[in-house]
Amino acid sequence: MNSRQMYEKIKERLVAHRHWTFRFDAKQDAMRVEDRRTKKGVTISLPGVIAKWHEQKDEAVREVVYYVEETLKTMEEDAALSGNERNIYPVIRSASFPTETKEGIPLLFDDHTAETRIYYALDLGKTYRLIDERMLEKDKWSRERVKEIARFNVRSLPTPVKEDRVADNVFYFVNTNDGYDASRILNESFLAGMRARVEGTMAVAVPHQDVLIIADVRNDIGYDVLAQMTMSFFAGGRVPITALSFLYENGKLEPIFILGKKRRT
């Protein structure tokens, strides 16, 4: 299964929507679906879908089709911030993620690390919409108000962790699939609490939006395992973020480059 074949498979499931257009981007290895009426759409990273398809077959395709249908349906609606304060959250994206909508409207975002940015989203139940300047103007909200509410809300999310051990290293995973697993990297009290549990070096990874990995690295093998694990999650994610990991020291995140059994910062 290659990217062109996956594009055709997804398109076949969506072509009944007569107002939608489909475009295959070979350079970006992606698929773009847009609604002609609203000029809005969604971009799908095809390698992640293919990786899931090898494990889940048709279920992986159904998941993407559902995501596209719900997202474009939501874009037809007029979303408001006022009255939806509990549904505003930060989302983590790669540093190369667009800073404006397809219509040229600036998105609300902050720099996070050299590899990541923080965007802000209005949760709409089955999907969400990234908050842009036009939404702020419409509801007469300030950027600071959105950010404050989003940070408060992400701290209120539960942080259940699953644990795995490899060669004396401990790996913790937050994977609730609520769309904001990676966002929990912004919960400073949670990270501080995990730091207290870690016996070795603490590393953190957000390979895609639906997982947060915290590693208790106690030997060189731990760095190799973390690198392989992060790359695997990154390749299989519907919304990939970064294949790099971060050292967590004194409340700060610093990207680490893992080569063989050595690390470089």
UniProtKB/Swiss-Prot annotation:
Domain of life: Bacteria
Family per record: Belongs to the UPF0354 family.
NCBIfam families: PRK13668.1 (NF010189)
HAMAP family: UPF0354 (MF_01548)
Name of this protein: UPF0354 protein GK2818
